[in-house]
Amino acid sequence: MSRIGKRPVTVPSGIEVSLDGTTLVAKKGNLEKRLETHGRVGINIDGSEVTFTRVGDEKQDAAFWGTYRALFNNIMVGLDKGYSKSLEINGVGYRAAVEGKTLKLQLGFSHDVNFEIPEGLDIKVDKNIITVSGTDKQAVGQAAAEIRAYRPPEPYKGKGVKYTDEVIIRKAGKAAGK
């Protein structure tokens, strides 16, 4: 029995939810998010609550039940409040700037790294802090991970791009010789 799947998802005010075949559609203003369930779960929309039910008794059906409920809850939170991730740049000469739809990073390479900002995401830069925000949890996390991957933090001086809440375990340098 999925403990996540059996909990109902509350729909915040201002968001309309409808069912289009096996696709759940959530609208807030001109934003629209769709979740295709492929008929793997039963869906019941009751006012401001959406409940999911298992279709079969297979082990895989229970997994899909909890997964689709969690994905739909992420859509509700994204449309209501949005998601954001913060990254911190550490290092001499390391900089970031937004130019149009491109994030320009100077990370100690012989060239600048240009990161194309994906559709639906917003990136802000304040000194050495990069904030990635948007309504799609997966897209926000993916973009933040791609930016971090250009220059992950190294354990000796901590130079690189890291999440603001990430703890870098530091290593001691080489011991001095005789």
UniProtKB/Swiss-Prot annotation:
Keyword Metal-binding: no
One Pfam family per UniProt: Ribosomal_L6
Protein's recorded name: Large ribosomal subunit protein uL6
Family, per entry: Belongs to the universal ribosomal protein uL6 family.
A GO CC annotation given for this chain: cytosolic large ribosomal subunit
Cross-referenced Gene3D superfamilies: Ribosomal protein L6, alpha-beta domain
GO molecular function terms attached to this record: rRNA binding; structural constituent of ribosome
Keyword match Transcription regulation: no
Keywords recorded for this protein, A-Z: Ribonucleoprotein, Ribosomal protein, RNA-binding, rRNA-binding
Gene: rplF
